[in-house]
Amino acid sequence: MSLGAADVGAGAGPPGQHAGAVDNWPVAIIGSGVVGADLMSRIGNGDGRLRVSAMVGTNPHCDGLARAAAAGISTSPGGVDGLLIMPEFANIRLVFDTTNPGARQSNWARLADTGVRMLDLTASAIGPCCVPAVNLDAQLDAPNLSMATCSAQAAVPIVAAVRRHGVVRYAEVVSAIASQALGPAERVTLDEFAELTTTAVQELGGARRAKTLTIVNPADPPMPMRTTVFCLVDQADEVARIEADVLAVVDGVQALLPGYRLKHRVQFERLGSGNTLYIPGTGEFGGTRITVLLEITAAGGYLPACAGNVAIVTSAAKATAEAIVEHHAQTVKAEL
């Protein structure tokens, strides 16, 4: 892949101190593994709102640092401490943390007082949780944003769409992710990611209760990520409108990641006498079960097609960063 050079723009001041509206922000990526490399490729050659000025990691021999260096991007194997002493850091406006749960606290601790913004792709919950298709506008001024998990990025917009038409008494999210698309760090944090997804489905999606299941799919050749979202609602009298809203949010997420799509039409099943379900912590339920089947493919970028779990988070992070830049430009313009 070919990425253009990302040299620092002339005349840029310290982080957070630019006097005028900024059309193109220099950013840094912490973490040179698969996630960081994919994010770098999605940002591209700097002809949009973002340009990668630095990438740092801890493995000097990893592919991500080699690709960044070949693209003219400054690199360091010194991690966040290496970033802080790079000449380019003086102009960095925003940092993406793509490392792992073990490093996320220390990375933000080192950067919190520098004035840079951070988008955390490790699902750390240090900052507010962000699903750009649902709650981006409310988070644009936060110094640290935690990108929701891959399952939450896929499912929360669906639950929120159903919630517009009534109370979602229970939502269940079942994601099957290719074994080849999960690294060692992700495998040991599956339970934590499930908890974070459940919280996002409730707090951002609006479900009263929720549950998340993650299945590691060993199929070879590997399959794309597939997420099934179940919503239990008392009534679903507006079937056509619910389906239309679900289709609209799918289109919205597709704008961020073209590989996000409905696998089948939205399904509605009436549950009644002799055909009820049990909601944990609530009891017997008779109403309507809405089922949405999604497939997430890593369209474009650095990843194989099966790694939709990574692509949906890097795509969401890129879109969030671009919105932050636009929001900052509009805010500065309004103050002039």
Swiss-Prot record:
Entry binding sites for NAD(+): 32-35, 309
E.C. numbers: 1.2.1.10
Active site positions: 150 (acyl-thioester intermediate)
Signal sequence region: none
Gene3D superfamilies, per database record: Dihydrodipicolinate Reductase, domain 2, NAD(P)-binding Rossmann-like Domain
Gene (UniProt): mhpF
Record's keyword annotation contains Isomerase: no
Domain of life: Bacteria
Protein name: Acetaldehyde dehydrogenase 1
Gene Ontology molecular function, alphabetical: acetaldehyde dehydrogenase (acetylating) activity; NAD binding
Biological processes, Gene Ontology terms: catabolic process
Broad class of enzyme this protein falls into: oxidoreductase
Keywords recorded for this protein, A-Z: Aromatic hydrocarbons catabolism, NAD, Oxidoreductase
Family: Belongs to the acetaldehyde dehydrogenase family.
Catalyzed reactions: acetaldehyde + NAD(+) + CoA = acetyl-CoA + NADH + H(+)
